[in-house]
Amino acid sequence: MTAIEKFFTEKSPDSEQVLLKVIELGIDFLGGEWKNVDKSQVNVSRVHGGQSNHMFHVTSSTSATPYLLRIHRQPPSQVFTDTVNLAIFSERGLGPKLYGFFEGGRMEEFLPSKTFDVNDVLVPENSRKIGAIFPLYHSINVPVSKSRRCVHLMREWLNGYESLGGGDYEILPTTVNYSDHPKSVSIKDLNHEIDNFEKWSTEIFEHTLVFSHNDLASTNILELNSTKELVLIDWEFGTYNWRGFDLAMHLSETAIDYRVPFPPGIKMNGDLIDNPPNIQIFCEAYVEADKKLKNRSPSDPTAEVKALIQECQFFWPLTNLFWALSAMKHSLLKFENGVDLDVQARDRLAVYFHLKPRSQKIYEELSKK
């Protein structure tokens, strides 16, 4: 834990030390009226919902510019990526303005908005809007590595799990009822799964490499109060990746509810995993928006939508393996985010092995073309 994270987590938001600190940050990065603000005029309120950041809404009773303060919990490499991405999107009007960054945190524009939850992303019209916004981000050229960071992260997490003393991992699902999985997996087994899926993906979908969010859970989608426009936030995993991985990541997360107020703090819905209700309209919206953005006319829109659905289905299990490996490592680190990470890891591994045969079938079909 960094010194500034410790400072903001151990002290009350209305403590004198915190009030003076946010005034200092306001003066340093925003200037203007913040130079004349007294601590009695400041309000700091915690914003709930962030798993990788501590967030605070800082306002005053004066005309000083309000701001959102993020105190990071992620590794420096992810913080760097997220900040670069935010700066790029900010300049293009695709997200909140970046006011400033410092060691351990950053300040950005506070957007009056509604944060989506899992119920919101399952509303068909919202799913259509989300599908339509993806091509806009996928078309952006971002000056970061074009390598598929998701695969590197999976290997890093697995190596971290092993270095922390992790070994064979028993798969005992809690919130899903799948049984078509091995009883346990070894580190060697998991490395093989990563290698094998990377091989399949590279062979049949390498041409789909785009800049991706890679973590579009419902809480990373804002609906602006003023226009009802959607804005995607929290880009710490934003890198180039296979398009289908990015889309499948969002669709996969619509089947998972983190609002469970008691252990294990997570519920995976098998019905939504096996029969995602909005995948058709989501992919239709993507194809239509992509067509308009690129000013093109697909010769067979129906076939294009069908192919995109297949692309999402192919990557769906990999998104669960991705987060399973993260949860395995962070469980050993005693990372706390309100979710039993071992339950999440076991359930996601069960989902991975349940859906993997479909991906293999898609690979075998497309590799013959």
Curated annotation (Swiss-Prot):
UniProt xrefs under SUPFAM superfamilies: Protein kinase-like (PK-like)
Give the record's cofactor note, including how many are bound. Less efficient with Mn(2+).
The membrane spanning regions, by residue number, are none
Q: Which reaction does it catalyse?
A: choline + ATP = phosphocholine + ADP + H(+)
Recorded metabolic or biological pathway in which this protein acts: Phospholipid metabolism; phosphatidylcholine biosynthesis; phosphocholine from choline: step 1/1
Q: Which Pfam families match?
A: Choline_kinase
Please name the GO terms of the biological process aspect recorded for this protein, alphabetically: CDP-choline pathway; endoplasmic reticulum unfolded protein response; IRE1-mediated unfolded protein response; phosphatidylethanolamine biosynthetic process
Please identify the protein, giving its name as recorded.
Choline kinase B2
